[in-house]
């Protein structure tokens, strides 16, 4: 599945067969995304983006050299993203320390790698995946319709919230399928589309779904709980980079989950990864810096869309 995804992005699938040293940290691990009925709100902001990733590369650098490079106080025991940059993404780009961080990567031929999960996006795409024939399209069309559907739902979160509550999503009763899909279609028709958007195609798919007797991925699930198991992203990395060495920052929940249910491929338990304390491992510390800026970047473009480049340009010219 990962090789198909890689090919869809026009990247050679041989890349994931390589041996790489991959260091990881995470940001925005929300554990769970659900609707809190008593407080009448989601437990976390719906536009939260979970990022898992860090530095790819051989070699290392000692903490004293990093403190000197970033001009940090002697009392600093480990480098964290807040030492390097602060504020929204456009503000972070003005940071001299961020520039030094990027120079360090270039000088050592290190790269930033990451996997991300947009909480709202992953909570709603199961609706489209439940429509007969939807996933049989070419990958580009699948991604296009999912992205458009996400924009529609994100633009009217209060209506989406009401639908989750009304239909106990993602535990929709079979007799409510038509009404649920019709409500989604109504939301889609209200959205202010850009030219070139495939809104008619999206509505057509939802119409098809409204005629189904079941929506397999959004029924018989725990109601009002849209996302659990962020360990799946860890599992995906481990089973994708099967020939590589993965060094991950200690995450107690993930370690416990893996002990209960080891990561395996074709029945073979994988041992290409290890969890470490970030304090003595500067590459994991640098991974915290990497995922932090990636997270800010992804959030920035999610908020500003096509205006992102203009806003960044204006910010840098101030």
Give the label of every model feature segment:
Residues 1-318:
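Phosphate-ester processing/binding pockets and catalytic centers
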């Amino acid at each position: 599945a990962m090789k198909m995804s890689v090919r869809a992005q026009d990247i050679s699938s041989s890349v994931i067969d390589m041996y790489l040293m991959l260091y990881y940290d995470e940001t925005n691990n929300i554990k769970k995304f659900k609707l809190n009925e008593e407080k009448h709100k989601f437990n976390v902001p719906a536009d939260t983006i979970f990022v898992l990733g860090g530095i790819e590369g051989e070699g290392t650098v000692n903490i004293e050299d990093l403190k000197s490079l970033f001009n940090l106080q002697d009392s600093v025991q480990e480098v964290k993203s807040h030492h390097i940059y602060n504020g929204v993404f456009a503000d972070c780009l003005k940071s001299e320390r961020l520039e030094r961080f990027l120079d360090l990567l270039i000088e050592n031929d290190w790269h930033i790698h990451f996997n991300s999960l947009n909480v709202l996006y992953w909570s709603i795409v199961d609706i489209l995946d439940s429509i007969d024939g939807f996933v049989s399209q070419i990958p580009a069309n699948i991604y296009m319709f999912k992205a458009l559907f996400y924009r529609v739902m994100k633009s009217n979160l209060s209506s989406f919230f009401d639908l989750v509550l009304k239909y106990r999503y993602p535990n929709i009763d079979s007799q409510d399928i038509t009404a649920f899909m019709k409500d989604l279609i109504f939301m889609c028709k209200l959205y202010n589309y850009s030219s070139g958007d495939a809104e008619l195609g999206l509505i057509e798919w939802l119409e098809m779904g409204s005629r189904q007797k079941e929506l397999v991925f959004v029924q018989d699930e725990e109601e009002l709980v849209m996302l659990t198991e962020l360990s799946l992203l860890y599992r995906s990395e481990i089973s994708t980079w099967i020939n590589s060495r993965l060094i991950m920052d200690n995450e107690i929940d993930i370690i416990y989950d893996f002990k209960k249910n080891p990561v395996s491929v074709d029945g073979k338990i994988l041992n290409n990864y290890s969890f470490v304390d970030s304090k003595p491992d500067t590459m994991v510390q640098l991974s915290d810096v990497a995922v932090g800026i990636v997270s800010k970047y992804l959030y920035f473009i999610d908020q500003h869309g096509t205006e992102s480049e203009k806003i960044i340009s204006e910010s840098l010219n101030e």
